[in-house]
């Protein structure tokens, strides 16, 4: 019988993490399960930095961005000796299970802990939408709205100055956020990790667009592919058109979660407690075809990688 659980947020924060925390805490307390909030991710687990969470701590979290528990990237957690110290703290606090909110890196840590005897449930919280075993992650749709709003504003000024704009979008090594934002924002050119980047080919496409009479355009590109400022200089030199690069950066992680993320966070938090009550462990939660599902974390990490939406990219190219 589960009497006490711990909850933490790990890695890059995303809008809706607080909504997950609220859902987990309220559902757990309704089943007479105590909840320990673990601060600053796995670093807090290592440092034994925990606090009992009550209704009053989470009552107003549904619409708040960020995470009240704090987050961090604690690379030392990859070391077994570090995890053993964290596990000692878990046993000292008499925690029966951990709920871990984050991305694939957080899932890997959850899998390690499960294999070392600490039952874990993973909930996907990241704007990158790159987590195994789910169509969407909590925070993705809020970030999408943020990026599309930025693209719309760039479109206004690019049109005024007959300028080429390059906008760098987060996503790590997944192009989902860039692709969806580019389609919704009407970007003429899309550069994502799933397609081999060829600078000369991109230039050729831009030159064709100029010959068609297009006086301005926007290039949407996922981070880590190239230096966008250098790319802007290259395009300007070759096309003789003013070209500017904009790096959106961490603004994409902030803001109040949109309705879909709030709903998804609430559903996943409830489902996590239901899984624990049924005796499940070593699971990750996802949403597939709008149905909340769960998978073995180890299986999901190895066999359920995100599928690239190539058909979506190919279809949108027909517009331009």
From Swiss-Prot:
Catalytic activity, as annotated: beta-D-fructose 6-phosphate + ATP = beta-D-fructose 1,6-bisphosphate + ADP + H(+)
Pfam families linked to this entry: PFK
Entry similarity comment: Belongs to the phosphofructokinase type A (PFKA) family. ATP-dependent PFK group I subfamily. Prokaryotic clade 'B1' sub-subfamily.
Protein name: ATP-dependent 6-phosphofructokinase
GO biological process per UniProt: canonical glycolysis; fructose 1,6-bisphosphate metabolic process; fructose 6-phosphate metabolic process
Enzyme class: transferase
Residue intervals passing through the bilayer: none
Pathway(s) where this gene product acts: Carbohydrate degradation; glycolysis; D-glyceraldehyde 3-phosphate and glycerone phosphate from D-glucose: step 3/4
Documented EC number(s): 2.7.1.11
GO cellular component labels: 6-phosphofructokinase complex
PROSITE patterns per the UniProt record, alphabetical: PHOSPHOFRUCTOKINASE
Recorded coiled-coil stretches: none
Amino-acid positions noted as binding ADP in the UniProt annotation, renumbered to this chain: 155, 186-188, 212
Regulation of activity: Allosterically activated by ADP and other diphosphonucleosides, and allosterically inhibited by phosphoenolpyruvate.
């Amino acid at each position: 019988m589960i009497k006490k659980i711990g909850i933490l947020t790990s890695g890059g924060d995303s809008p809706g993490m607080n909504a997950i925390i609220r859902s987990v805490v309220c559902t757990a307390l309704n089943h007479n399960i105590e909840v320990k909030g673990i601060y600053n991710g796995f670093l807090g687990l290592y440092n034994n930095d925990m606090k009992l969470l009550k209704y009053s701590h989470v009552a107003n979290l549904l619409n708040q961005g960020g995470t009240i528990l704090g987050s961090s990237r604690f690379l030392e957690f990859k070391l077994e000796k570090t995890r053993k110290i964290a596990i000692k703290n878990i046993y000292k606090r008499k925690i029966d299970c951990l709920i871990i909110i984050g991305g694939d890196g957080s899932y890997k840590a959850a899998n390690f802990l499960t294999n070392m005897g600490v039952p874990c449930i993973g909930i996907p919280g990241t704007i990158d939408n790159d987590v195994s075993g789910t169509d969407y992650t909590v925070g993705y749709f809020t970030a999408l709205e943020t990026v599309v709003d930025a693209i719309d504003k760039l479109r206004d000024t690019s049109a005024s100055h007959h300028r080429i704009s390059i906008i760098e979008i987060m996503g790590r090594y997944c192009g989902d956020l860039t692709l969806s934002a580019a389609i919704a924002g009407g970007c003429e050119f899309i550069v994502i990790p799933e397609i081999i980047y060829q600078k000369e080919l991109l230039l050729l496409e831009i030159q064709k667009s100029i010959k068609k009479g297009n006086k301005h355009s926007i290039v949407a590109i996922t981070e880590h592919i190239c230096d966008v400022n250098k790319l802007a200089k290259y395009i300007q030199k070759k096309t003789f058109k003013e070209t500017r690069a904009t790096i959106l950066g961490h603004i994409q992680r902030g803001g109040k979660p949109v309705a879909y993320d709030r709903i998804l966070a609430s559903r996943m938090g409830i489902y996590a407690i239901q899984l624990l009550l049924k005796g499940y462990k070593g699971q990750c939660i996802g949403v597939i075809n709008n149905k909340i599902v769960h998978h073995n974390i180890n299986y999901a990490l190895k066999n359920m990688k995100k599928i690239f939406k190539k058909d979506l990219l190919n279809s949108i190219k027909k517009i331009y």
